[in-house]
Amino acid sequence: MDSREFRRRGKEMVDYIADYLDGIEGRPVYPDVEPGYLRALIPTTAPQEPETYEDIIRDIEKIIMPGVTHWHSPYFFAYFPTASSYPAMLADMLCGAIGCIGFSWAASPACTELETVMMDWLGKMLELPEAFLAGRAGEGGGVIQGSASEATLVALLAARTKMIRQLQAASPELTQAALMEKLVAYTSDQAHSSVERAGLIGGVKIKAIPSDGNYSMRAAALREALERDKAAGLIPFFVVVTLGTTSCCSFDNLLEVGPICNQEGVWLHIDAAYAGSAFICPEFRYLLNGVEFADSFNFNPHKWLLVNFDCSAMWVKKRTDLTEAFNMDPVYLRHSHQDSGLITDYRHWQIPLGRRFRSLKMWFVFRMYGVKGLQAYIRKHVKLSHEFESLVRQDPRFEICTEVILGLVCFRLKGSNQLNETLLQRINSAKKIHLVPCRLRDKFVLRFAVCSRTVESAHVQLAWEHIRDLASSVLRAEKE
């Protein structure tokens, strides 16, 4: 394919994408395929000779689309949103064309510097404390990670290194292996499974703190665990506070937990993967109160801020906490400006070496939507979630299980878990809408998350009518 054909095919692909998204509402939101469906539709080996572009395009509808779950359908209410917008798609095209691997400033100055500036832009939108911003010569700063899971792992490994070095400075005879056995981290019993995985990868203990009646980690429970473990000779070093849990969008009490972490010299990491986008709205900024106590903070613009995956925003107060943990400096990566104090080499802020020009997506989206446009988008989703909540409350057969704060509604039929499992199975088998469940204490709960960029009140109303009709069918069957 030369540039002439690329121009033609590129325009065709833009048309295909626009047609796909314009018509996505007419496609079943969940695919009707069985595991292994695709292997029977494609050859077992790659072609020896080139195939035509026309053949590939035909196979998209024939082979790929039948197995796609349409995350951007206005009838997709599962998980949490995954962001999508035309400006971000255009930026991704440019990112692919430039094709740099921005591991250092010298590898692509624009890639590095735009990321630093965009992370400061976003930090200011969130009203983060100045300590988290890079500015012109700040000690902190932001970095784009691949996911919130990656950000949690980076923070844990940095905290582990920092604590071990502090302990060895005071007692040089202590080995890293001996200290690793004593290190312990903490998070809520409602935290994402990625926190547990970070502990597994990092080789440290992770303890779940029991949450309160609102599924929130509170100071008393954390303090009790810290004191018990210290008395047993363990060394607390890391706490993850979740703002907007995956199960029910609950919020740990940051204002209570933060001071304890600071008093104990424990690294405090905030995981706000979903909810963090809402903090750009003044009416939701209170949910981030206490961020000043944190050492690191993370949320995913690729969830709810119209920046396509992947783009996970992470800030730290002290960049040296990361660079001292991850610094590797082989001669083939060195460059003349790296010791100048004027640049950032993001390879020292992350797990992998390579990194894409992801800040282009932020630049395009922030400029083409503006802060007001992004705020309006968040507010629309929150309004729709409250509309759904109101519909549920009007039906005495159902109950709302947690406070609705942002774009997630947790609800269920009053009755047994089996009744709700049957309802969910009926909902997803019908393939008109898509939901996933959670478990809150001993209850099986349905989650209704407002996700699509194009979802409107009419879609919410139709979804509720569908759920209500299926519920009637399930309840009738139970009585028979």
UniProtKB/Swiss-Prot annotation:
Binding positions for pyridoxal 5'-phosphate per the UniProt entry: A148, S149, T246, N300
Modified residues (N6-(pyridoxal phosphate)lysine): K303
Pfam annotation, one family: Pyridoxal_deC
Source superkingdom: Eukaryota
Outcome of swapping Y332 to A/F: Abolishes decarboxylase activity
UniProt catalytic activity: L-dopa + H(+) = dopamine + CO2; 5-hydroxy-L-tryptophan + H(+) = serotonin + CO2
Modification N-acetylmethionine occurs at: M1
GO terms for biological process, alphabetical: aminergic neurotransmitter loading into synaptic vesicle; amino acid metabolic process; carboxylic acid metabolic process; catecholamine biosynthetic process; catecholamine metabolic process; cellular response to alkaloid; cellular response to growth factor stimulus; cellular response to xenobiotic stimulus
GO function term, MF aspect, one: enzyme binding
Cofactor(s) essential for the protein: pyridoxal 5'-phosphate
Complex and partners: Homodimer.
Family statement drawn from the similarity comment of this UniProt entry: Belongs to the group II decarboxylase family.
Name of the molecule in the record: Aromatic-L-amino-acid decarboxylase
